[in-house]
Protein backbone atom coordinates (compact mmCIF):
# COMPACT_ATOMS: atom_id res chain seq x y z
CA UNK A 1 0.00 0.00 0.00
CA UNK A 2 1.36 3.39 -0.96
CA UNK A 3 0.57 6.25 1.42
CA UNK A 4 -0.30 9.38 -0.54
CA UNK A 5 -0.48 13.04 0.41
CA UNK A 6 -4.28 12.91 0.48
CA UNK A 7 -4.38 10.04 2.98
CA UNK A 8 -7.06 10.56 5.60
CA UNK A 9 -7.54 7.80 8.15
CA UNK A 10 -10.67 6.94 10.14
CA UNK A 11 -10.32 4.87 13.29
CA UNK A 12 -13.72 3.40 14.18
CA UNK A 13 -13.90 2.64 17.90
CA UNK A 14 -11.68 4.45 20.41
CA UNK A 15 -11.08 1.79 23.03
CA UNK A 16 -7.84 0.14 24.11
CA UNK A 17 -6.93 -0.73 20.50
CA UNK A 18 -8.37 2.20 18.57
CA UNK A 19 -7.29 5.15 20.69
CA UNK A 20 -3.54 4.43 20.76
CA UNK A 21 -3.69 3.72 17.02
CA UNK A 22 -5.54 6.99 16.33
CA UNK A 23 -3.08 8.94 18.47
CA UNK A 24 -0.05 7.57 16.62
CA UNK A 25 -1.55 8.07 13.15
CA UNK A 26 -2.71 11.55 14.22
CA UNK A 27 0.90 12.61 14.71
CA UNK A 28 1.57 12.18 10.98
CA UNK A 29 -1.68 11.87 8.99
CA UNK A 30 -5.05 13.59 8.99
CA UNK A 31 -6.93 11.19 11.26
CA UNK A 32 -10.49 11.04 12.53
CA UNK A 33 -11.21 9.05 15.68
CA UNK A 34 -14.86 7.96 15.61
CA UNK A 35 -16.84 6.50 18.49
CA UNK A 36 -20.58 6.21 19.17
CA UNK A 37 -20.07 7.11 22.84
CA UNK A 38 -20.60 10.87 23.16
CA UNK A 39 -19.07 11.06 26.65
CA UNK A 40 -15.96 9.22 25.39
CA UNK A 41 -15.49 11.78 22.62
CA UNK A 42 -16.10 14.64 25.06
CA UNK A 43 -13.42 13.43 27.50
CA UNK A 44 -10.89 12.90 24.70
CA UNK A 45 -11.53 16.39 23.34
CA UNK A 46 -10.73 17.68 26.84
CA UNK A 47 -7.44 15.77 26.81
CA UNK A 48 -8.43 12.98 29.19
CA UNK A 49 -8.53 9.21 28.63
CA UNK A 50 -10.48 7.41 31.36
CA UNK A 51 -9.08 4.04 30.22
CA UNK A 52 -5.53 5.32 30.82
CA UNK A 53 -4.38 3.76 27.53
CA UNK A 54 -2.94 7.11 26.44
CA UNK A 55 -1.59 9.89 28.63
CA UNK A 56 -2.29 13.59 28.22
CA UNK A 57 1.07 14.30 26.57
CA UNK A 58 0.41 11.72 23.86
CA UNK A 59 -3.06 13.13 23.24
CA UNK A 60 -1.59 16.61 22.84
CA UNK A 61 1.07 15.41 20.38
CA UNK A 62 -1.59 14.22 17.91
CA UNK A 63 -2.10 17.55 16.16
CA UNK A 64 -3.85 16.00 13.15
CA UNK A 65 -6.42 13.99 15.13
CA UNK A 66 -10.10 14.94 15.30
CA UNK A 67 -12.56 13.15 17.63
CA UNK A 68 -16.17 12.73 16.55
CA UNK A 69 -19.44 10.84 16.83
CA UNK A 70 -20.62 12.21 13.48
CA UNK A 71 -20.35 9.95 10.42
CA UNK A 72 -20.17 12.99 8.12
CA UNK A 73 -16.71 13.68 9.60
CA UNK A 74 -15.37 10.39 8.26
CA UNK A 75 -16.91 10.60 4.76
CA UNK A 76 -13.76 12.12 3.29
CA UNK A 77 -11.49 9.42 4.74
CA UNK A 78 -9.93 6.89 2.40
CA UNK A 79 -8.60 4.40 4.94
CA UNK A 80 -10.97 2.95 7.55
CA UNK A 81 -9.61 0.92 10.45
CA UNK A 82 -12.33 -0.81 12.46
CA UNK A 83 -11.39 -1.45 16.10
CA UNK A 84 -14.75 -1.96 17.80
CA UNK A 85 -15.23 -4.38 20.72
CA UNK A 86 -16.08 -8.05 20.20
CA UNK A 87 -17.33 -9.12 23.62
CA UNK A 88 -18.48 -12.64 24.44
CA UNK A 89 -21.87 -13.78 25.69
CA UNK A 90 -22.74 -16.15 28.54
CA UNK A 91 -21.83 -19.15 26.36
CA UNK A 92 -18.48 -17.51 25.55
CA UNK A 93 -19.46 -16.94 21.92
CA UNK A 94 -18.42 -13.65 20.32
CA UNK A 95 -21.07 -10.95 20.08
CA UNK A 96 -20.50 -9.55 16.61
CA UNK A 97 -23.16 -6.83 16.68
CA UNK A 98 -20.69 -3.92 17.11
CA UNK A 99 -18.54 -5.28 14.26
CA UNK A 100 -21.52 -5.72 11.94
CA UNK A 101 -22.89 -2.25 12.76
CA UNK A 102 -19.51 -0.59 12.18
CA UNK A 103 -19.09 -2.48 8.90
CA UNK A 104 -22.53 -1.41 7.69
CA UNK A 105 -21.82 2.21 8.61
CA UNK A 106 -18.47 2.25 6.81
CA UNK A 107 -19.96 0.38 3.84
CA UNK A 108 -22.34 3.29 3.24
CA UNK A 109 -19.40 5.69 3.05
CA UNK A 110 -16.97 3.75 0.85
CA UNK A 111 -15.69 5.20 -2.39
CA UNK A 112 -13.61 3.65 -5.17
CA UNK A 113 -10.08 2.75 -3.97
CA UNK A 114 -10.89 3.17 -0.26
CA UNK A 115 -9.29 0.65 2.09
CA UNK A 116 -10.95 -1.07 5.07
CA UNK A 117 -8.83 -2.79 7.72
CA UNK A 118 -10.13 -5.01 10.54
Question: What label would you give each PLM region?
Answer:
Residues 1-118:
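Structural/interface elements that position substrates and couple domains in central-metabolism enzymes
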Amino acid sequence: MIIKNNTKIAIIGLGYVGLPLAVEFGKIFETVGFDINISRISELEKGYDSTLEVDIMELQESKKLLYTTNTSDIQSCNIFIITVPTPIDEQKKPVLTPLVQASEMVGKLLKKDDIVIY
